[in-house]
Design a protein with these regions (language model features):
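N-terminal transition regions in large eukaryotic proteins
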Residues: 1-154, 174, 183-194, 205-208, ...
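Alpha-helix N-cap and coil->helix boundary residues
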Residues: 66, 164-165, 195, 199
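Amphipathic alpha-helical interaction segments
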Residues: 70, 168, 199-203
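Short, conserved phosphate-binding/catalytic loop or strand-edge motifs used
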Residues: 165-171
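Tandem alpha-helical RNA-recognition repeat domains
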Residues: 171-178
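Eukaryotic alpha-helical solenoid repeat scaffolds
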Residues: 199-200, 207, 211-223
């Protein structure tokens, strides 16, 4: 393969013996941790019943790649529903934000979505002149999803809106929430692209507006 496990182009190092050994060790550890998370994350009850100390210990070691899509929404203040209630967003839906009228941020969002991870397999868009294009049949699906996510956030947080750099934060979350990378042990994983977007959107909101992170403060016009 010309890309690594995360979808980025492989460098010369990937073909070395050291890289192969590292990859084998990583895959073995990931397989062990995957089974632990399969036992810990219930399809309908989330992390209910899991001792806090155990959850913290495994969370700090990192959520296995195949479980990030399912785990991250559950881990943001113990679930998206609870987070939305605490943030006063209970009645707001992702789809309603996506369907918001055009805003003054659309132009800069349009420029940034095609600059996001340009060499990544999911974001790459091939056009005749070798450049990137926005919209149209040749647009990568991830770019379309990222555009909707960023527009939705700008509609939700009108004080912050959109600022250059937010596209990479949202893009990384979108890659982690990709249904194609979910664990085979995840019994409740949907393969719907719209679900991928929403699973990305609310962790983005939690990261930006949550009291422990307040990432949005770095993007405010007054910053």
């Amino acid at each position: 393969s010309t890309t690594d496990a995360w979808g980025f182009p492989q460098g010369a190092w990937h073909g070395t013996g050291e890289a192969v050994k590292f990859q084998q060790t990583t895959e073995e550890k990931d397989a062990e941790r995957d089974l632990k998370w399969a036992r810990m994350l219930h399809p309908t009850k989330g992390f209910s019943g899991v001792p806090t100390a155990v959850l913290k210990r495994r969370w700090r070691k990192g959520v296995p790649r195949g479980w990030r899509r399912a785990a991250w929404p559950e881990l943001m203040d113990h679930g998206p529903a609870e987070f939305k209630t605490a943030a006063g967003l209970r009645q707001i839906t992702y789809q309603s934000l996506v369907n918001s009228p055009p805003s003054s941020y659309d132009e800069v969002i349009e420029k940034d979505v095609v600059r996001t991870f340009p060499r990544h397999a999911r974001f790459a868009t091939a056009v005749a002149d070798g450049g990137r294009s926005a919209g149209g049949d040749d647009e990568a699906a991830a770019i379309s999803s990222l555009r909707r996510i960023l527009r939705a956030y700008a509609a939700l947080d009108k004080e912050c809106g959109y600022c250059q750099g937010m596209n990479y934060v949202a893009g990384l979350l979108l890659l982690a929430c990709d249904s194609a990378s979910r664990s085979p042990n995840d019994p409740c994983a949907s393969s719907d692209a719209a679900d991928d977007e929403e699973r990305c959107f609310w962790p983005l909101v939690a990261t930006a507006r949550g009291p422990r992170t307040r990432l949005r403060d770095l993007y405010l016009p007054s910053m």
